Amino acid sequence: MGATRLTNTLTSTLTTVLAVLALAGCQPATGATPDTAPQPATPVAASAARNLLAALPVRAEDTGAHYRRADWGDWTQHGRGCDTREQVLRDQGRGVTVGAGCRPGCPANVAPCWVSPYDNTPLRDPVAVQIDHRVPLKEAVRSGARTWNQQQRQRFYNDPTNLVAVSAHANTSKGDKDPGRWRPSNHATWCAYATAYVATKHTYGLTVDPAEHDGLVSMLATCR
């Protein structure tokens, strides 16, 4: 997808996607300190996600053989010396302290500051928290991002609506798998996970393969 087309796609779908994410309890990073556990997606968000999923092209994936992690860059710097990872740790945690250089911390006298939504694992050490791309980088390449330029890849890599603070075990288990091959062991998060996943695919003009589509349908069926 060319730069102009991707920009137009992002602009035209941003309002819809942000509304879906907000209703699903998957807010973009804002500097707030929400509860550690994501809120269940509302029926309105689930309905919107089903409509977005129905609009996604269903086709066989690229092999992804041309994927190179180095092509996607690293976390970008934001205000007050914070990078994207540090912002996600701050925004998706509870009771998080911010030290010199925007270094997040978790005081010993409070409950663990993070709970991995994929497996309900409580986490206290910020170094042990990993940041997952809900739609994996390699999955993006397999489903339409092969021709993106560096700016487009960097934007996707740092998009907070696609980032989740999780346990190392959950992140390793998931790897670059899509919902046709992997789903969170915590079934309570399936609805919110699928809702946000579909929104990201729609925002970036990506496709889904048949198994991935069916996996998303199954997860959205858990929405109440």
Residue ranges and their predicted role:
Residues M1-L14:
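Bacterial N-terminal signal peptides that target proteins for export
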Residues N8-T11, D83, N158:
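Intrinsically disordered, low-complexity proline-rich regions
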Residues T16-L21:
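Sec-dependent N-terminal signal peptides
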Residues L23-G25:
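C-terminal motif of bacterial Sec signal peptides marking the signal peptidase cleavage site
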Residues Q27-T30:
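Bacterial signal peptide processing site
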Residues T36-W114, Q130, E139:
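Cell wall/extracellular polymer interaction/catalysis modules
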Residues W114-R224:
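Domain-level detector of nuclease and nuclease-like folds
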